[in-house]
Design a protein with these regions (language model features):
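Acidic, Gly/Pro-rich loop/turn segments at junctions of secondary structure
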Residues: 135-192, 245, 250
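Short helix-boundary/capping micro-motifs
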Residues: 13-31
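A late-sequence structural motif
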Residues: 187-188, 236, 254-293
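Secondary-structure junction motif
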Residues: 157, 192-217, 277-285
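A short LG(V/I)-centered, amphipathic sequence patch enriched
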Residues: 21, 43-65
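Alpha-helical linker/hinge and terminal dimerization helices associated
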Residues: 45-46, 67-94
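A ligand-binding cleft/hinge motif common to bilobed small-molecule-binding domains
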Residues: 155-165, 226-255, 261
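Central regulatory/effector-binding core of bacterial HTH transcription factors
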Residues: 98-161
Length: 293
């Protein structure tokens, strides 16, 4: 099998991200026939159909999704190679770390775990330019962004039965307990309706919920944890929330411990083996670990 060239990888990514050969051609400054020819060549080299063609465009097959994820990650290594080599050339005895560092994180982690780490990272390595995207921790979540090649490092919830996508490296940064949060001064918070949001916790914590006969089914669903906190503060219900989310709690709510057998969740970083060896990702992991606790 012949190796795919960088331009062939770029074309695969462009077709997947634009949803069609014509749109990919326009984005890359190529003709549609050149894009079609390149994709057919890539399919012949890889021995698999990568895109389903239709009148409305092109969508990756399962094989295509895997190919595009690898393509993104390989192209990213080309970028990092250039940045690290240039930094080594200017380092005068030590490596100068520079370039874009792509980070994916769920909302409360982006608000509370990342800022102190990024502040120290900027002080030590001013040439690094972090790009942070907040993603919902549902389904593949932040770990999926890393696996798909859209992020160099993700801040994700760990420890679920599904685990991180195969082939990724991870490390625990914090273990946070869940608490009962309810309107301040309420005489019987457990009698209130339960408020929840989709990305609150995984199935491993939900099993604890199901074993508690005092927890009703959620009657109110909100978009995110900030909305849940606001609604609880307005007296509309109670909620069970992790500590990171509760850092935004105001005097409008009270927080009650759920005891030593209450649920906990692990929050950590996720990256690929190739990104784990890059200078910028290694530097960020060091800062995240020093933020730990």
């Amino acid at each position: 099998m012949s190796d795919l060239l960088p331009q062939e990888l770029r074309i695969l990514v462009a077709v997947a991200e634009t949803g069609g050969f014509s749109a990919a051609a326009a984005a890359l400054g190529l003709t549609q026939s050149a894009v079609s020819h390149s994709v057919r060549g890539s399919e012949a080299k890889l021995g698999a159909v990568l895109f389903e063609r239709g009148r409305t465009g092109a969508s990756p097959t399962r094989a295509g999704e895997r190919a595009v994820a690898h393509a993104r990650r390989i192209l990213r290594l080309y970028e990092v190679m250039g940045a690290e080599v240039r930094g080594a050339g200017r380092g005068e005895g030590r490596d100068t770390v520079e370039g874009v560092l792509r980070i994916a994180a769920f909302r409360s982690a982006a608000l509370h775990l990342l800022p102190p780490a990024l502040e120290r990272l900027a002080a030590r390595h001013p040439g690094i330019r972090p790009e942070v995207r907040v993603v919902r921790e549902i389904g593949a979540g932040a770990a999926g962004e890393v696996a798909e090649g859209r992020a160099d490092l993700g801040i994700a919830t760990l420890g679920s039965p599904e685990g991180a996508p195969p082939g990724l490296l991870s490390g625990v940064l914090a273990e946070e307990a869940y608490r009962l949060v309810h309107p301040a001064g309420h005489p019987d918070p457990k009698a209130l309706p339960l408020m929840d949001w989709d990305e609150n916790c995984g199935s491993y914590t939900r099993s604890w919920w199901r074993s508690q006969d005092w927890i009703p089914r959620a009657t109110v669903k909100a978009e995110d944890d900030a909305m849940v906190l606001t609604m609880v503060g307005r007296g509309l219900g109670m909620a069970i929330m992790p500590e990171l989310s509760l850092r935004e709690a105001t005097e409008a709510v009270d927080i009650t411990d759920l005891g030593p057998r209450g649920p906990v969740r692990q929050v950590g970083y996720v990256t690929t083996p190739e990104s784990a060896s890059t200078l910028a990702v290694r530097a960020l992991i060091r800062e995240l670990r020093s933020t730990k606790g």
